[in-house]
Amino acid sequence: MRYIRLCIISLLATLPLAVHASPQPLEQIKLSESQLSGRVGMIEMDLASGRTLTAWRADERFPMMSTFKVVLCGAVLARVDAGDEQLERKIHYRQQDLVDYSPVSEKHLADGMTVGELCAAAITMSDNSAANLLLATVGGPAGLTAFLRQIGDNVTRLDRWETELNEALPGDARDTTTPASMAATLRKLLTSQRLSARSQRQLLQWMVDDRVAGPLIRSVLPAGWFIADKTGAGERGARGIVALLGPNNKAERIVVIYLRDTPASMAERNQQIAGIGAALIEHWQR
C-alpha cells in the first residue's frame, strides 16, 4: 500500500509539467481555431529540401494581405537581375498617389524614393503606397500574377491594389494564396536560380529588418534564433505572417500562418499566431 501511495504521489508530481507544457503544433492550431472562432492555415517547410513538416489547411485559400509584398519585391529583384530595373532608380510621386498607412513614402513627396528604398519601406514598414508604386513597375496586379505563373505558382493571385486587396470577403478568391503555395514560392525566390544570389540576400535582409512584426513570432523567439518575416493584416479578422526561422542564427525552415473569418481583436490574433509559433519552436527543440 505504501508503495502504491508513493507511485501516486510521484505521478501527481509530474502533472503540473504536463499541464503547463506547450501543446503540439497541430493541437495548438486546433485550439487557436476554437478560441478565434475562425480559420487557421499553416505550413512548416524545410528550406533546403522543400519537405513539408507540419501542415493544417495548407491547400485552402487565405487572403495574402501585406505578405504579398515579399513576392512583389522578389518580382522587382527579378527585373533587376534581368537588367530591366535598377534599385537606384528614383521614382517621383504625388499626394494623390498616397493611400492609407504610408509612414515612409508620405515623408518623401518632395524628393521621391528609389526602387530599393520603396522595397525596404514595403517590407520593413509595410508601407502601402510604396507597394503600389512598385506594383506599377511590374505591370500591376496582373503583372505580379503573371510573374507568379512564370515561376510555377499556379495558385497565388493578386487582383487589386492597396488597400482594397485587404477586403478578405468570405469565399472571394481575389488576392489570395494557400499556405503551401506561398511557402513554395518563397522557397523558390530564396533558394533557386529564379533570383541571383545577390538578390536573394537582399530580399532576405529586407525581411530580417522587418520592424512591424514584434508581437507575433518574434515575441516568442529564443535567444540566438534567426528570423526574417513579413506580416499582413486585413478586414474580417484576416492576419498572416510568412517567416524563415532557425536556431544558431540560421534560416532552416519556412513558416506560413494565415488567419481569416474571426471576430477576434488584433491583439488576440497576434497572440494566437505567437502561440502557434511557440508550439512549433518547442516541438522543433525536442
UniProtKB/Swiss-Prot annotation:
Changing Y101F: Resistance to ampicillin unchanged in DH10B E.coli strain. One of its GO terms (molecular function) is beta-lactamase activity. Residues 1-21 form the signal peptide. Inhibited by the beta-lactamase-blocking agents clavulanic acid, sulbactam, avibactam or tazobactam, or SA1-204 or LN1-255 via a covalent binding to Ser-66. Inhibitors SA1-204 and LN1-255 may be approximately 16-fold more effective than tazobactam. May also be inhibited by tazobactam via a covalent binding to Ser-126. Changing R160S: Reduces resistance to piperacillin about 60-fold in DH10B E.coli strain. Decreases resistance to combined piperacillin and tazobactam about 1000-fold in DH10B E.coli strain. The active site is at S66 (nucleophile), E164 (proton acceptor). GO terms for biological process: beta-lactam antibiotic catabolic process; response to antibiotic. Changing S126G: Reduces resistance to piperacillin about 8-fold in DH10B E.coli strain. Decreases resistance to combined piperacillin and tazobactam between 4- and 16-fold in DH10B E.coli strain. Changing N270 to A/L/I: Reduces resistance to penicillins about 60-fold and to cephalothin about 120-fold in DH10B E.coli strain. Decreases resistance to combined ampicillin and clavulanic acid about 8-fold in DH10B E.coli strain. A beta-lactam binds at K69, S126, E162. It comes from the Bacteria. Its EC number is 3.5.2.6. It is an enzyme of class 3 (hydrolase). InterPro entries: Beta-lactam/transpept-like, Beta-lactam_cat, Beta-lactam_class-A, Beta-lactam_class-A_AS. Changing Y101 to A/C: Reduces resistance to ampicillin about 100-fold in DH10B E.coli strain. It holds the Pfam family Beta-lactamase2. Interacts with S.clavuligerus beta-lactamase inhibitor protein BLIP. The class A beta-lactamase family has a specific amino-acid numbering system, sometimes called Ambler or ABL numbering and often misspelt as Amber. A multiple sequence alignment was used to derive a consensus sequence and then the consensus was numbered taking into account insertions and deletions. This allows use of identical numbers, e.g. for active site residues, despite differences in protein length. UniProt always uses natural numbering of residues, hence there appear to be differences in numbering between this entry and some papers. Broad-spectrum beta-lactamase which confers resistance to penicillins, as well as first- and third-generation cephalosporins. Has nitrocefin-hydrolyzing activity. Inactive against the cephalosporins, cefotaxime and cefoxitin, and the carbapenem, meropenem. PANTHER family: BETA-LACTAMASE, BETA-LACTAMASE-TYPE TRANSPEPTIDASE FOLD CONTAINING PROTEIN. This is Beta-lactamase SHV-1. The lineage of its organism: Bacteria, Pseudomonadati, Pseudomonadota, Gammaproteobacteria, Enterobacterales.
